[in-house]
């Protein structure tokens, strides 16, 4: 009888340990997924600058969701085809003067198949004696969505901080 009670106790302990192990496995899988999502979103943010600087507006536009919106100092457009046409008209190409964007300070929050991101940008141009000069700097405020298994911009708002194109960031307002 004692062996039966001990065996029953061990069986009950194992039975309760299995859900805990599954829960830990599920938590680990969730954490790994969040890390992978964050890395894919960082790559999306960097590819935005890369395609913009290369004047590859087709690849650039494909970073946006089917109903994705780009909004900035030049206007607001919706949908990849409209974004591509807008950029081809607004930004001359090819990039013969070797200007480029530097992107930094990524803050990314993932929530399932949606995410938000905030980042900084600087636009660098050739200066006197062929030195690099920061001509503009600003921030991006992004809403992202997983579409067809890939992260895309649902909405990207580009704001200039220097020179200013509007009110200062909320953090600097009193």
What is each residue range found by the language model?
Residues 2-15:
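Bacterial N-terminal signal peptides
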Residues 17-50, 54, 62:
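Short, low-complexity N-terminal intrinsically disordered segments enriched in polar/charged residues
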Residues 52, 64, 121-123, 157-160:
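Short beta-strand segments enriched in hydrophobic/aromatic residues
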Residues 57-122:
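A solvent-exposed, acidic/Ser-Thr-rich amphipathic alpha-helical stretch
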Residues 95, 124-134, 163-164:
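Short, cysteine-centered beta-strand-loop-beta hairpins and adjacent loop/turn segments enriched
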Residues 101-103, 135-140:
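Short, surface-exposed coil-to-beta transition loops
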Residues 116-118, 137-167:
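Short beta-strand edge/turn micro-motifs at domain boundaries
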Residues 166-174:
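Extended, polar beta-sheet/loop recognition surfaces of beta-rich domains
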